[in-house]
Amino acid sequence: MRFKELVFLLKIDEEELLEKLYEEGFFNFAIEENKEGDRLLRVYLREGETLPSFLSNWKILDERLTTPKDWMVELEPFEIVEDVVVDPTEKVTRTDKIVVKLSPGVAFGTGLHPTTQMSVLFLKKYLKKGDRVVDVGCGTGILAIVAKKLGASYVLAVDVDEQAVEVAKENVQKNSVDVTVKRSDLLSEVEGVFDLVVSNILAEIHLRLLEDVSRVTHEKSILILSGIVDTKEDMVREKAQKKGWNLLERKQEREWVTLVMKRS
């Protein structure tokens, strides 16, 4: 599959950008910093897909046709947290660590972002062998794959974006793990009860998730919420408390917060 890649100078902060992109249902993008310290936004348009409306008056710095393979060449294997290695090259053979083979594609979740790193850290800490796990807003599927490699008995990965679902399925196949991947708007297509729910999405979407997550959890279930910018942490915690979730642990990297909760 080929995409049109457009590069823009990032004019607004990351939180505002993510809100605008998610409001328009646009998920195929990347944020990076160049050698001069400028923050750049790269968006990837499939054939026939239109640019998010708020970008229409932004100046395009660069434009080219590209494929997912082009985006992976600059990514080298790295340790996302202790003993968990992300390998975009598919060349790492070591057996003393958990290795996740990853084709980032155009879905959020290469493992480089602090929200993903904190999510993996808490999966390592709270997931017990044999747990049933659901990853809500799975993106590349990285958290679901880690959960399975950590010993979960059943893992379901869901995302509302069809491209993310396809990328996640590809990554599951690369890692030879038994993870079910399907399209779902949060938990709308999810049935059953899970021991652990992990979700690395925006704070506003967590508010929607909290409306329904009790339906698929039990009194001892663990809920990991990541992707929360610190200025919106309070509203997520207040909503969680109203829905019967108590805070177990909190971690912050830069402006990003991850919360671990348990049913009260």
Swiss-Prot record:
GO terms for biological process: methylation. Keywords: Cytoplasm, Methyltransferase, S-adenosyl-L-methionine, Transferase. One of its GO terms (molecular function) is protein-lysine N-methyltransferase activity. It catalyses: L-lysyl-[protein] + 3 S-adenosyl-L-methionine = N(6),N(6),N(6)-trimethyl-L-lysyl-[protein] + 3 S-adenosyl-L-homocysteine + 3 H(+). It comes from the Bacteria. SUPFAM superfamilies: S-adenosyl-L-methionine-dependent methyltransferases. GO terms for cellular component: cytoplasm. Transmembrane segments: none annotated. Its EC number is 2.1.1.-. S-adenosyl-L-methionine binds at residues 116, 137, 159, 200. It is found in: Cytoplasm. Its main location: cytoplasm. Methylates ribosomal protein L11. Belongs to the methyltransferase superfamily. PrmA family. This is Ribosomal protein L11 methyltransferase. The gene is prmA.
